[in-house]
Amino acid sequence: MNKHLRQICMGLSLLLLLGSKLNLFAQYASGGSPLSLSLVERTQSLRSLRHDDTLHLDAPSKATLSEWLQKDKQQTNELRPFHFAVPIATQIRLGQGQWTQTPNGEHIYRLTIKASGAKSIGLHCSRYIMPEGASLYLYGSQGTLRGAFTAQNNSESHTLSFSPLPGDWVTLEINLPAGISPNQVDLQIDKVYYGYKSFLDLKSTNNSARASAVGEPLYNYLETGLERLSCAPNIVAYPEYSNQARATLLLIAEGAYSSTGVLINNTRQDGTAYVLTAAHNINRIYDEDFISETPNDPKTIEKVREVCKSIIFFFGFESPSKDQDIRGSEEKTLSGATLIAYDEEHDMALLEITGLPTNAQGIRSIPASYNPYWAGWNISREPQGPFFGIHHALSSTKRICIAEDQKIHLYDYSINKGYEYLNRDISWKQAHWRIEEWRLGTTETGASGSPLFDGNGLVIGALTGGQSNCNNPYRDHYYALTQAWGGEHDTRDNIFKLAPWLNPDNQAVSKLSGYDPYSSKPVQRLSPFYGEKTQGLMKSYQAQEGVSGQGRIITLSHDTDVLGAYIQLGRFSLSQAEKPNYLIELSPIEGGLASSTPIWSTRLNNYNFIRYNRKTGEMKEEERTIGEDEVEVFIPSLANEKIPAGSYLLSIRTTDDSKLDYPLLTTQYRNTQKDYQQSTWAKSIGSTWSKSNTLGRSLWIDLLIQGDKQNGNGTPNIPNPEQYSAYYYGGQLYIQNPQGEATAQVYDLIGQRYTEVKLTEGENIIPTNSLLPRQIYILSIKGTLGSYSIKFRP
């Protein structure tokens, strides 16, 4: 299988269907549910909405589908998209549906689009303009709901794509509050994407429900993805690279191509949402049916511009645990981009995100809850290492790879061999940096466009391709910024250069530091668990009779804005209809008791992402795949609120005071049972909150805040237990021995001992570069405080 280009072509994986009465946040949607679903049940005047107009579309001919299926068979598995849908050109207007007015003056519009035999239906809006207060929802034949899409989804291009819904029909519903006229809505659908393959085409033989929905990050691609990335650590294990990690994004184009990009700074440092990636991520991997024989042909560029409108950008898709794979939050997404710069001669592409919501000051910007960072850059021809890369290989959670080289060189690079579908020579002369060997980690398919950083954390290139993997971590090629930079600004060919955009005022600089828009008012995740070693400590919550809620005490040392909350879900197989609504609340502690009136609250009843529908060209909200993986969900604040300093109970409870019976992930503090009793609280059914003497574990709920830096991680002032800790980095073992005597020993997996060191109190650093050949080892520590061990690989 050819593995040069590091982009993954996403297929229609197993879609775990959630229920229809679920609010859906994703891309940037405000949640809620369609007005008709609630009003139909309680008012006779809207019964006609059950019989809304249906638009029947002709399915593609058998010859057309046969042609696509035959083409699929001829494509390579690694470099070509998994085609699951074909577009049907349409001219759907609002006049083809039905408007109804409620007794309260609200307007409801519904139109059902049906394509017999389709495995999925997707939409693309060539015109999308929603007035303030309007909400648009989509729901399908299998109970899937997306929305609400609102005026915040309006963009300068006035287009929007919605990811496909399973089944052969989809209903579009628009809700307008009283006082808003239907004439203020402008909606036109020019493409419907007819899914001709079902999720069974990629379903593995063991019938696991771990695959992803169409257009969703694959996470564990074909159930081997996590294993293939076993040598590439979760980025949270390396907090020293947190800024660069904040800048690195997962991209999904046309609902089918998954890759990586990086938010990149410009010399005006104005927060322009530029994203650097690889050209082949947005030109269908130099497909002869897409690109012209002439490089950078204007016709190709126009096609690429259309692809950019379909891109979904995922922020912060990463595991919150160092050692355990948890499917990261998918709720922080933005959709749509415009093409800024593009050059096939270097495989370079620069995009600008267009689907930005409007903040409280009326400015379109990336939300603070996404915690963005704009990476700096270095166009020197002699950058200094050590070099490292951050990526979303295999469309999975964010990973890191590190090389120890101090210098790097330019090489020729070609991808022609084994690519029968190319219509011209695809090679580059002295355009690519080459990483000879990754000392830690690897890239993989899906890492295309990911940034390569120098020793100062500045971007020097983006990944084009290579053949590295965990067993062969060698020779990856990144196009060099210095080669793709371009000379003097010239409006005639600025699209082929980076310089006019990243250095718009033509300043005499070759390096630029990163940009943190929230450095004076940082975004902070309050958590005693985030990034900690939690392997073996996490398990699903065991429901307790008579308990309707659980929480833990947090302390805020300064006034702060609450942006939202994270919660970790364990594995489960309940249908969405069986999942009750939950409230996440922050309640003041007064006189040792939790106030019955929370100061802040948000609702957990949905988990969504945004997807592009190739048939319709629209963006749609999709319910996340929830099932066989531990999953992190981000629940945004309905409105940012200022919270004063003090002690609070951060809790989750059922809305109807029924038993808390849900596979929420729990973990334990590294403290004593007495400390559990001080920090873990429970709510009894029909009663109030009180300290728990029996639970012994805490639900993993974290608060996301913005403001002055908090002292600590929000945990109450309870002494942490004395225990050993250790990690491996850069050829050295770093070991903390809080007190007493201790000995560290290193073994291989067959029990052969390589070294033994007596530890002093405090930090101990043990070099291992010349000591250990490359393989997996066990560090074992024994001493006054007991025993401790970790696995590591030099």
For each feature predicted by the language model, list its residue ranges.
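C-terminal subregion of chymotrypsin/trypsin-like serine protease catalytic domains
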Residues: 289-305, 323-334, 341-343, 453-525
